Curated annotation (Swiss-Prot):
Organism: Prochlorococcus marinus (strain MIT 9313)
PANTHER family (UniProt xref): LARGE RIBOSOMAL SUBUNIT PROTEIN BL19M, RIBOSOMAL PROTEIN L19
Protein task: This protein is located at the 30S-50S ribosomal subunit interface and may play a role in the structure and function of the aminoacyl-tRNA binding site.
Keywords: Ribonucleoprotein, Ribosomal protein
Name of this protein: Large ribosomal subunit protein bL19
Gene encoding the protein: rplS
Positions of region (Disordered): 1-35
Amino acid sequence: MTADSKDTSMSEDNTETATAIENSSAMVTDVTSKSAPNVRLSPDALIKEFEASQQKSDLNDIYVGDTVRVGVRISEGNKERIQPYEGVVIAKRHGGIHETITVRRIFQGIGVERVFMLHSPQVASIKVERRGKVRRAKLFYLRERVGKATRVKQRFDR
C-alpha cells in the first residue's frame, strides 16, 4: 500500500464511522408507534399521538357562562375522595390536552376562582348544571359585581 491509498481508506473509515454515529443517534430519537409497527414518527407526530391518548373523550360541551359542578380528586393520606366545586365558568383557555376553564363561586361572601385543566386526572367529572346566556368570551366583569348582579341569564336552546 502506498501512502495515498492509506489516506483514502482512513477517510472512508471515518466517513462510515460518522454515518454510523449519526444513524445511532437518529435511532435513539426516533420512536416507533404502537399502532403502526416499523413506522417512525416525527417528534411533533409523536407528541400529538401521546396527547390524543391522554385526552378525555367523555366531556360535554362547556361554554363560558355555564354553571358547572366539577368533581375534584383529593388525596388525604392513603384515602382518596371526590370534592364537588360548583360555580360559573368565567373563562376558557387553550385547546386540546391543555384546555382549561376558570370557575368562580362565592364562598362565605368572598369570591373564589379556581382554574381546572379539563383533561387532568385530578378532575373526576364535570357536569353542566345550567347553561348561561352571555355575550362575552371572558366574564371578568363579574369580579366587580356583588349579590344578584353576578347572576347570569339562563339559556334554553343548548
